[in-house]
Each structure stands twice: as C-alpha cells, then as structure tokens.
Amino acid sequence: MKIITVLIIYFLSFTVHSFPLPKENKATYDVIRKNKVIGSIETTFNNEDSTLEITTVVDIEVKVLFVTAYEFYQTSIETWVDNEFIKIEGYADFEDEREYFIKGEDIDNIFLASGMDGELKLDKSILPLNYWNKEILKQNKIFDTQKGIVREIQVTKLKDEEIEINDKKILAEKYLFNATTHPKDKGPFPEYTLWYAKNEELLKFRFINWKDKKEVITIRNNWDQ
C-alpha cells in the first residue's frame, strides 16, 4: 500500500544563506489523510557556535480495521557550518523491503554522496530536499534525502493565500513544486503545494497520491506566532 511512499522526501547555493529557526528550536507537523492523522514529522535544530544540526524524523502508520496496512519511517541529520551545507546522514525504511542508508559530505570541493544509485560526485552547492529550507525553491537540482539521488526541480510561485492553523488565520506564500521521476521510483513524483509564513517558516504542504488519488496534507501543529 504505497500511500505515502514519496510523502516526505521530506524536509544553498555556495553563497551564504541563513534560514529561520522556530521557537524552542523545533517544528512539528501532523500528516493527515482522509481527515485522520496518520503520522508526524518533527524537525529539531541544534545550533552551537557556527554549527547547526537539523534532525528530521518522519513516522507514518496507516491502519485498516486495526491492522497496519502501511508504514514508513525516515530520519536524517543535516550539518551546516557557517551557514553552508556540508554533511548529511539519513535512513529511510519503506513499506516494502526497500531501505536506504544515505550519506553525503563535502570533501575537496566535491559533495560525495551515496544512496540508491551507489556513490555520486556532486557539485558542492547541492542542497538537501528539506522543505523547511525555502532556499531549495531557488535551485534547479536537489539531493533527495530519502533515496540519495539527484532530482531536477521546477517551482512556480502562486498567489498568496490565507490558511488556518490552530484557529489562527495566516497569510502564507504559496508555491507549486515538481521534481523529476527516477527510473527506480515505484510511481511518479507527485506535485506538491507548499505554504510558507512571511518569516519563511514552513507551515503546510500537500499532494495527491498517484495510486489512490487521495489527498495527503502535512500541517504545522506547534505554530504560535
């Protein structure tokens, strides 16, 4: 049951970039399908001196008649030094027997990465696909942290839209996000809709699952601005 296989390939160019840190250094989200919470995303930020570690955990479980029909788990740790992305370690466990151990690090002006396709030598300016970092919307290519591959992306800015979180109305920037499909993907990469607060924090994203045509929404649950 591939309900969320591509749900979170979830959350700089070489120029310096500083993205927002949430209150209490944590952003948490509910993952919702058919009006039911089926999982969570938690991103924590550990900022010490010039080093920032961003840890993201995705935990999804779908039950049908009290029986687990689908599970997905992913974790990743990004390391940034002086506002530059230099390292990542990750793990993704899919609903079938697929699992990937992801690594990447800047070495000698090359980003050496490994994942589904083995070892890759990439431009050191590559960014990880973490929707929290709005800077990814300016890129042409990103590093997929779920499978350890490169995807080309295309982003379209839409009209700002008012959304509601925790009974608060927020005027958010809205974008469409598309990425190329890899030959080993089980299905097409879905089109994502992303909403960001004016301070650039990620508030919400959604997509339509290609297999069952159901909408999956991920929305911030600890927003208190």
Regions found by a protein language model. Give the residues of each.
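Acidic/charged, solvent-exposed loop-and-adjacent secondary-structure segments enriched in E/D, K/R, S/T
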Residues: 107-127
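Alpha-helical interaction segments
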Residues: 1, 19, 121-122, 185
